Amino acid sequence: YGVSVCISGSTGSGKTTLMSWLLSMVPNNRRLITIEEGSREFDLIKRDAEGHAINSVVHLLTRPSENPALDIDQDLLLERVLRKHPDVIGVGEMRSAKEALSVAESSRTGHTVVTTIHSNSAESTYRRMMTLAKRKYNMADEILMQIMVEAYPIVVFTKQLEDGSRRTMQIIEGEDYKDGELIFLSLIHI
């Protein structure tokens, strides 16, 4: 249905706000499932004048537990979501090695994924995802980078400026990763 997107930037740069807006643009006839950790920031259910939901949205939250058998983490929710035939999956933020690879693999299986990650630039976003995944998985850098480029063809980099405003600074399309070089097309650069 769509193209997977990773929105990157530092804390306070507007990643979640932009992601929420993008997800709000998903047509009402498409099934949207969000996964968030800790607290719910997305409210994407649209209602008619009588208060009835007019779109198909499911919001899910992780639930940590001291008992590992009762822990409901992002990875477990993502595994379950894939069986629910989503048109679009919104994953609040990639923070761990496990999440970085499992979210990427979901995108590579034909699901449209929108997610966020902390990084310093559009280009460094792919390397950030790769190094996050590398913490747990012993895979060659080249393979991990190719996975990330395939999983997220589009990277949007956001930044909070000195005056406090938040802006999209760059949008790139990752094309490939060969011989240690990210091959990408800069779609917008401010």
Functional labels for PLM-detected ranges:
Residues I188-I190:
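Conserved small/polar residues in nucleotide/adenosyl-binding loops
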Residues G2-T11, W21-V149, K159-Q160:
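Switch/coupling sub-region of P-loop NTPases
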Residues L144-D179:
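Phosphate-binding/switch region of NTP-binding enzymes
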Residues L18:
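Hydrophobic positions on the alpha1 helix immediately C-terminal to the Walker A/P-loop
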Residues K15:
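Conserved lysine of the Walker
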